[in-house]
């Protein structure tokens, strides 16, 4: 449902931010 989509989106954002930090 919508909640699953939101959670998936937040996880994607969190992973992207984490990867950006680790690459620095």
From Swiss-Prot:
Keywords: Amphibian defense peptide, Antibiotic, Antimicrobial, Secreted. GO terms for cellular component: extracellular region. One of its GO terms (biological process) is defense response to bacterium. It is found in: Secreted. Is synthesized in the stomach and stored in a novel granular multinucleated cell in the gastric mucosa. It is stored as active, processed peptides in large granules within the granular gland secretions of the skin. Belongs to the gastrin/cholecystokinin family. Magainin subfamily. Antimicrobial peptide. This is Antimicrobial peptide PGQ. It comes from Xenopus laevis.
